[in-house]
Amino acid sequence: MSHPQPLTPEQALAGAKKRLELPRIVVICGSTRFMAEMAEADLRETAAGRIVVKPGCDMKSPHALWSDPAGAEALKARLDELHRAKIRLADEALVVGDYIGDSTRAEIAYARELGKPVRFTHPVVDPGVAGDRRHGDGPVTTRAGR
């Protein structure tokens, strides 16, 4: 007699989202230099009927929460883990901007490792495209870009 396999946490979450009839959840990824573009992407995704989660802190802008270097380092680690949780929660990722740095590249790899679809506002910077060496070395200018 065979026993049913227990659900993985991912399967349980997917089932719960379906039973709750939740809209698709999109996580916005990208360099915090693109916070304004992330806000625009949030607006567009929300208007399209999707739930949006995105970075909530721009540590490149001065703020009392990260003015102490030691505290800032610990906060950055917590925020990175929080963003990975947002990626796990989401149904898909949207990468904003025409530049992919190390952190964003790691987020893309993590989302793909989890089997999440990944969209780009600037597909030319997709690190999954064979032979594309333009990411991570600076901004990429595209006709569809800024």
Label each region the model flagged:
Residues M1-R146:
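Conserved catalytic or regulatory cores that recognize and/or transform ribose-phosphate-containing ligands
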